[in-house]
């Protein structure tokens, strides 16, 4: 929990200003996977759990941007995107990912969490609607570096979107642990 809050510039007894500076330096030099691994076992209703889900989606996009972008475009043109009202007003996927990158590099604050989590949840729902194999796992290969319970469950994108929406709601009312 301390590293997740420190990422947002919120120190505690474990993270004084110097420790915050070092963490941000680690993140800016490619240390996000190391820190994100610490969050992988955290429940979805906590900040580290939500950040873990942000990290996984962002990594999938950076690894396979064409596939994710194609599914996003297909989803935008789907007859229905479960969980989103019509008409769909969605930001460009690249902008949503840019915000995720900024969040995970320590450039955002806790006031930004609700919007970022909500936008990422919308993006996940849109990508899921663009996938003709609805109900499939997000990551199919158990040896994939992104293969975790979150990504290998049936309907992973929709379920992860729901979890991020819950985290956004908790962030809005100041109850995100």
Residue ranges and their predicted role:
Residues 1-29, 34-36:
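Leu/Val/Ala/Ile-rich N-terminal alpha-helices, chiefly Sec-type signal peptides and the beginnings
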Residues 15, 25, 33-99:
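Long, charge-patterned amphipathic interaction tracts in eukaryotic proteins
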Residues 71-168:
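Helix-driven interaction modules
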């Amino acid at each position: 929990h301390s590293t997740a809050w420190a990422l947002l510039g919120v120190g505690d007894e474990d993270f004084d200003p110097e420790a915050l500076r070092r963490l941000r330096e680690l993140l800016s030099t490619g240390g996000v996977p190391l820190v994100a691994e610490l969050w992988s076992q955290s429940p979805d209703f906590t900040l580290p759990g939500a950040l873990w889900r942000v990290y996984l989606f962002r990594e999938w996009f950076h690894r396979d941007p064409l596939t994710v972008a194609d599914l996003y475009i297909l989803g935008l043109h789907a007859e229905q995107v479960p969980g989103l009202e019509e008409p769909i007003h969605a930001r460009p996927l690249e902008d949503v990912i840019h915000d995720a990158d900024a969040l995970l590099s320590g450039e955002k604050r806790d006031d930004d969490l609700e919007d970022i989590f909500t936008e990422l949840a919308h993006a996940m729902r849109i990508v899921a609607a663009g996938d003709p194999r609805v109900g499939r796992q997000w990551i199919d290969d158990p040896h994939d570096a992104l293969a975790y319970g979150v990504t290998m469950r049936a309907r992973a994108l929709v379920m992860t979107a729901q979890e991020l929406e819950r985290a956004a709601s908790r962030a809005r009312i100041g109850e995100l642990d």
